[in-house]
Amino acid sequence: LQANRQYLFQGSLKPGPELPEEMKQGLPFLGQPDGQGRFPLRYQGRI
């Protein structure tokens, strides 16, 4: 969190075998997975 109340989150999501099938079907909305099966996540905004 910056002094002007802005934030930036960068990370990734790697679905495991325990992830429900319904959630796996929604993963393409996050984009393409990398070579290790991780979906990139990046969010920014102001609180």
Swiss-Prot record:
Annotated family = Belongs to the GSP N family.
**Where is it localised?**
Cell inner membrane
Q: Which domain of life is it from?
A: Bacteria
Query: Where are the bilayer-spanning segments?
Result: none
Q: Name the Pfam families for this protein.
A: T2SSN
* Protein name according to UniProt: Type II secretion system protein N
* GO cellular component terms listed in the entry, alphabetical order: plasma membrane; type II protein secretion system complex
* First-listed, main subcellular location of the protein, grouped into a coarse class: membrane
For this protein, the record's InterPro entries field holds:
T2SS_protein-GspN
Q: Which organism is it from?
A: Aeromonas salmonicida
Signal peptide positions are none
Q: What keywords would UniProt list here?
A: Cell inner membrane, Cell membrane, Membrane, Protein transport, Transmembrane, Transport
